[in-house]
Curated annotation (Swiss-Prot):
GO molecular function, one term: metal ion binding
Record's keyword annotation contains 4Fe-4S: yes
Cofactor requirements of the protein: [4Fe-4S] cluster
Gene that this sequence comes from: ispH
Organism: Thermoanaerobacter pseudethanolicus (strain ATCC 33223 / 39E) (Clostridium thermohydrosulfuricum)
Catalytic site: E129
Record lineage: Bacteria, Bacillati, Bacillota, Clostridia, Thermoanaerobacterales
Name used for this protein in its record: 4-hydroxy-3-methylbut-2-enyl diphosphate reductase
Length: 288
């Protein structure tokens, strides 16, 4: 048996920084209440551990509950400009760990919106990152996530197009070709995070070489779902699991070359636990 791990898998820089910041705030022990706006990452194990240590998840509609001096961690997905203004008025201490790649998208959108450009975001309109980015152009962006939706765009005089940072490269390029037909004066920025691209490319390459592929990450994690889609094109035996507990003998018993990758919200220890469980189920030490 061989266990092969994708060259790029697990925590990305932005997520790692967000988690480290949350634990640093806990260690300060200054008695202030600590909240995260939404789950800091799509990983139930990490969320559970933070909750036990006093970091509570709060949703946008609950922000009125915050009082002066409370700490609010803005997660790597980022938020709208209006939200920053609202929190400043309330006297809430904002700990901003918006991913630098997402911050770049926000800045582009803000700049070109104020130059008079229509804004087009290619991505999932319900994803927190896209919702936040749209908030930097007063929620006026056209959000498209398919070729069909791109064809439904009106003819625009001038527009600026950006991508959700976790988008699949081909998806962005295909939709962009349609957008070009719809805009007379188009400026576009490929704002897909290079860590996302490296993770996707590595998963694509590995899934061509294995008998079974495990994609580890939260079931609600956008980037993990995309990894699964990429892998299952090459390997029909592709499983999306959150942790080692979901692994069964049935998944591995007939396979000798086993591939493992993980989403940006998956800690190293979860990946290690999955590998240990695979070895246990196969009754072998294996090699990596």
């Amino acid at each position: 048996m061989k266990i092969l791990i994708a060259e790029y898998a697990g925590f990305c820089f932005g997520v790692k920084r967000a988690i480290e910041t949350a634990y640093q705030e806990i260690e300060k022990g200054d008695g202030k209440k600590i909240y995260t706006l939404g789950e800091i990452i799509h990983n139930p194990q990490v969320i559970s551990d933070l909750s036990k240590k006093g970091v509570n998840v709060i949703e946008e509609e609950e922000l009125d509950k915050l009082t002066e001096g409370d700490k609010l961690i803005i997660r790597s997905h980022g938020v709208s400009k209006k939200l920053y203004d609202f929190l400043a008025k309330k006297g809430v201490e904002v700990i901003d760990v918006t991913c630098p790649f997402v911050k770049k998208v926000q800045n582009i959108v803000y700049e070109y919106y104020h130059k008079g450009y229509s804004i087009i975001i290619v991505g999932d309109r319900n994803h927190p990152e896209v919702i936040g980015v749209n908030g930097w152009c007063d929620d006026t962006a056209y959000v498209v996530n398919s070729i069909e939706e791109a064809y439904e765009l009106p003819q625009l005089e001038k527009a600026c197009a950006v991508a959700q940072t976790t988008l699949i490269e081909k998806h962005w390029k295909d939709i962009l070709e349609v957008i070009k037909l719809k805009v007379k004066d188009l400026i576009f920025f490929n704002t897909i995070c290079d860590a996302t691209q490296k993770r996707q490319d590595a998963a694509d390459e590995l899934s061509k070489k294995v008998d079974v592929m495990f994609v580890i990450g939260g079931k609600h994690s956008s980037n993990t779902q995309k990894l699964k889609k990429i892998c299952e094109k090459n390997c029909k035996n592709t499983f999306h699991i959150e942790d080692a507990e979901e692994l069964t003998l049935e998944m591995v018993k007939d396979h000798e070359i086993i591939g493992v990758t993980a989403g940006a919200s998956t800690p190293d220890y979860v990946i290690e636990d999955v590998i240990k469980k695979i070895r246990f189920l196969k009754g072998e030490d294996g090699d990596e």
